[in-house]
Amino acid sequence: MSNYPKSGKPIPQISMFEVESANIEAVGYHPETMTLRIKFKSQNIYYDYFKAPSGFFIEMMKSESKGRFFSTQIKGQFKFEKIEL
């Protein structure tokens, strides 16, 4: 397991679930660390959003538009780090 570039903390292993979306490829959640991971289709990079309550993952998975949910509910709301896995 590697570490986050900024904080140096270990990067958790997170199971990813492919989603139907024009921009988002997959989403995953690690409940112990409250980390929401999102992989966008346009990049081979993952974004980990920290201290995200599990409800955000559940609601995102249920949402009709994953991209709209991300833009209105997640983007700008949580600290994040870009990682390459």
Language-model features: locations:
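Acidic/histidine-enriched, beta-strand-rich ligand/metal-binding domains
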Residues: 2-85
